[in-house]
Curated annotation (Swiss-Prot):
Tissue distribution of the protein: Component of the acid-insoluble and acid-soluble organic matrix of the aragonitic skeleton (at protein level).
Predominant localisation class: secreted
InterPro entries: CAP_dom, CAP_sf, Compl_asym_regulator, CRISP-related, SCP_GAPR1-like, TSP1_rpt, TSP1_rpt_sf
Protein's cellular compartments: Secreted
Keyword Secreted among UniProt keywords: yes
Disulfide bonding pattern of the chain: C118-C155, C122-C160, C133-C145, C175-C212, C179-C217, C190-C202
The keyword Repeat is assigned to this record: yes
Protein name: Ectin
Domain TSP type-1 span(s) in chain numbering: 106-161, 163-218
SCP domain sequence ranges: 256-362
Alphabetic keyword roster: Disulfide bond, Repeat, Secreted, Signal
GO cellular component, one term: extracellular region
Organism taxonomic ancestry: Eukaryota, Metazoa, Cnidaria, Anthozoa, Hexacorallia
């Protein structure tokens, strides 16, 4: 009789085995047939070979098997036979409708996860990826997944000669807000050692930001993405974040100077460097280096974007020069024209834009060959229809 209170399916069976008191081994095979029968098999190993007539018949054994069912499973047949060394036991079980014990499902691997970052930028680095036996997990006595859950492979086998290395991170700046929630930043430089070959640029971020929190203001908290306050042409320009000054790297400063020099030709005010924009640009530049495509970020919000790709190791100043050259084809009489052939130029000189952040990624594509991906982010964004005339000013003869 079925009893709903049972939560464990109980099997009773006879074993033909050599009774030595050892724990019963796990079933090696579990099959669910189409007629509602479940068959399980296992091999009972013996410590030494014996003649078949030396194998006594064991007393009746009873074994509990787990189940998520609330019904009782009934054993209908128990077969076994012996050879000289082992006993091969097969248990055949019939399951009434609703007995969860008979819903056998073997485990299957999930998809491989993403590769971890390489443990070294050159020499003998390694990276790994993993997967889990959860798609689905084994249930009802089903088999575990076959194979390994982790793979490890070599990466960045190139020589370290001429490859740059990062300095230690500098100190975190003070919080950009004197109370509640703000942002702080720190930087490092590719000077330990500096690269001596074009493809030797350091990989990764030269700066990072984090949310900071202070107390003292009895007002609602808000997040500030305060930008840098920068002198546009000074070779010693610095970024102001709260009360602490963080110097730009030489390449960041050169990039900012190149932007502001071109903007001055068109009567646009100088830009300020923004670490948050630069971080966003760096994330997308790394994505482009992986896909080796040049396309705008489809998820960008409230930021303008200029893109640059080239064979070889180039710098931001090269990209700015290329973007500015688009201006020779710009039609100053068309206030509603957004032209892909000149959109980098118009964003570069857009009068109402006030902040910029740029990232450069140099990707090794083959031995001795690299590609450069440069992404610039701007805010407020430019290239707004109906606003070109007031934001893209025709240069005067004196400015040319």
């Amino acid at each position: 009789m079925m009893q709903a209170s049972f939560s464990i399916c109980i099997l009773s069976f006879y074993l033909l085995s050599f009774c030595h008191g050892a724990p019963l081994p796990a079933f090696l095979r579990s099959v669910l047939s189409g007629n509602g029968m479940k068959e399980e098999s296992r091999v009972l190993k013996r410590s030494a070979p014996v003649m078949q007539d030396e194998i006594p018949v064991c007393a009746q054994n009873q074994t509990d098997r787990y189940s998520s069912s609330s019904r009782l499973c009934r054993l209908v047949k128990d077969l076994g036979f012996c050879d000289f060394d082992d006993l091969y036991q097969t248990v055949l079980q019939s399951c009434p409708i609703g007995c969860g014990f008979c819903r056998v499902e073997d485990g299957n691997w999930s998809v491989w996860g993403a590769w971890s970052p390489c443990s070294a930028t050159c020499g003998d680095g390694q990276r790994s990826r993993s997967r889990s036996c959860t798609n689905p997990p084994p249930s009802g006595g089903g088999a575990d997944c076959l194979g390994v859950s982790q793979e490890i492979e070599d990466c960045n086998r190139r020589s370290c000669e001429g490859i740059g290395g990062w300095s230690n991170w500098g100190q975190w700046s003070a919080c950009s807000e004197s109370c509640n929630i703000g942002i702080q930043a720190r930087t490092r430089t590719c000077t330990n050692p500096p690269p001596t070959i074009p493809e030797g640029a350091c990989e990764g971020f030269s700066f990072e930001t984090q949310i900071c929190s202070t107390s003292g203001c009895n007002v609602s908290a808000s997040v500030s993405t305060a930008a840098a306050t920068t002198s546009p042409v000074s070779s010693t320009a610095q970024t102001q974040i709260g009360p602490t000054v963080v110097s730009l790297t030489a390449k960041q400063q050169a990039c900012l100077d190149a932007h502001n020099a071109k903007r001055a030709i068109h009567g646009s005010p100088p830009l300020e460097w923004d670490f948050t924009l630069a971080m966003n640009a760096d994330e997308w530049a790394n994505e482009l280096a992986v896909t080796r495509q040049l396309e705008h970020d489809p998820n960008i919000m409230n930021e303008g974007e200029n893109l640059f790709k080239s064979a070889g190791a180039l710098e931001c100043v090269d990209a700015v020069e290329r973007w500015f050259l688009e201006g020779k084809d710009y039609d100053y009489e068309d206030d509603n024209k957004l032209d892909d052939d000149t959109s980098n130029f118009t964003q570069l000189v857009w009068r109402n834009t006030t902040r910029v952040g740029v990232a450069t990624v140099v990707e090794v594509v083959s031995e001795g060959s690299v590609e450069t991906y440069i992404v610039a982010r701007y805010t407020p964004p430019g290239n707004i229809e109906g606003k070109f005339e007031e934001n893209v000013i025709k240069p005067s003869a004196e400015a040319l």
